[in-house]
Amino acid sequence: MSSTTLTDDQIRDNERTEVLAKATAAKNIVPDIAVLGTGPKNAILRAAADELVARSAEIIEANASDIEAGRANGMEESMIDRLALDESRIEGIAGGLRQVAGLTDPVGEVLRGHVMENGIQMKQVRVPLGVMGMVYEARPNVTVDAFGLALKSGNVALLRGSSTAVHSNTKLVEILQDVLERFELPRETVQLLPCQTRGSVQDLITARGLVDVVIPRGGAGLINAVVTGATVPTIETGTGNCHFYIDAEAKLDQAIAMVINGKTRRCSVCNATETALLDAALSDSDKLAVVQALQEAGVTIHGRVAELEAFGATDVVEATETDWDSEYLSFDIAVAVVDGVDGALAHIAKYSTKHTEAIATQNIETAQRFADRVDAAAVMINASTAYTDGEQYGMGAEIGISTQKLHARGPMALPELTSTKWILQGTGQIRP
């Protein structure tokens, strides 16, 4: 072994030292970034957008290294799609920064307030969270989204991306730091953490006192590991095992179009439809029409073969228990027949990740029952699951879709990246 070769323990020690050093540097600049004015923040975001486009060739070259390594290591094409960057996607990422620049700055917003009987003026205002850690998988666009939303909301970003996107993320952060430096702001406003081992994730999520919040974004394994292992507060952006229930009183052509859109528009994202639930009261021909339309769109059907063959379906892959709670992220979908809206609700309650659940029906009472009783961050009534998206909501870019119930639920946009502070201004009052 060469004298310059590091042992596994030395690599871990170096990673731990680097994570804690970067977290400390981030914590030290929190007071300055928290009070940065809206004008400077917007100027930085717009300059960063321009710089990303201007240096797109550098980004694409770095990204090509990641894609080459991914394919060499047998990465699935759905994951390659998440990883890939081209000029069009870089323009889209830059557009996201410009959009964030145009959004209302949440910092300092007065949520409520009044004058107390003794004359003290009190108000509750939005303030940044502080040091915001992000742990995410092979989606380099998250690097820029996290920076933009963190900066606009007055937060400092610590980013722990995937080793599969290390070249892309390194180049993106380098460009963002160059822009910050041009505006005489610390490069530590956004930092990329090492990703040689999984231990660096543990270093980040246990850096209590240095890191104020950690937001995991990725598959179920990653999210569970972060949430269960963290001593730092976390915001869970859950996986998307999204269901689409087609009621007997749905407009069938409309329902088919929505379920195909939810499945095929972009199958590798968390708002993709993963399970179609068919009302048993639908005619056999209507059930078959749904399945065949999905197959014609290139989607593989998983289900109880006997159940689906009973209404004429063919080429069905026998489903196991895993299929019902899977986030496929591919051109696969699970299909089941259920006993009306209550059957759909029961199935969803058992397998849902509480992300997005949808219903197609023309019956107002059925739609209301579904919306009232389903437990999810978003409920779609006669709309595709693909609409669960911060930009579609008019909120701009998002960190992720929170599926938990505390602090925030749904798209994590600017207001969701703040906390609050109570400010009381008196004239010398003392409490009796």
Curated annotation (Swiss-Prot):
Q: Which domain of life is it from?
A: Bacteria
State the top-level EC class.
oxidoreductase
Q: In which pathway does it act?
A: Amino-acid biosynthesis; L-proline biosynthesis; L-glutamate 5-semialdehyde from L-glutamate: step 2/2
Compartments where found? Cytoplasm
Q: Which GO terms describe its molecular function?
A: glutamate-5-semialdehyde dehydrogenase activity; NADP binding
- Swiss-Prot/TrEMBL keywords: Amino-acid biosynthesis, Cytoplasm, NADP, Oxidoreductase, Proline biosynthesis
Q: What does this protein do?
A: Catalyzes the NADPH-dependent reduction of L-glutamate 5-phosphate into L-glutamate 5-semialdehyde and phosphate. The product spontaneously undergoes cyclization to form 1-pyrroline-5-carboxylate.
Which protein, by its recorded name, is this?
Gamma-glutamyl phosphate reductase
Q: Tell me what organism the protein belongs to.
A: Corynebacterium glutamicum (strain ATCC 13032 / DSM 20300 / JCM 1318 / BCRC 11384 / CCUG 27702 / LMG 3730 / NBRC 12168 / NCIMB 10025 / NRRL B-2784 / 534)
* Lineage, uppermost ranks: Bacteria, Bacillati, Actinomycetota, Actinomycetes, Mycobacteriales
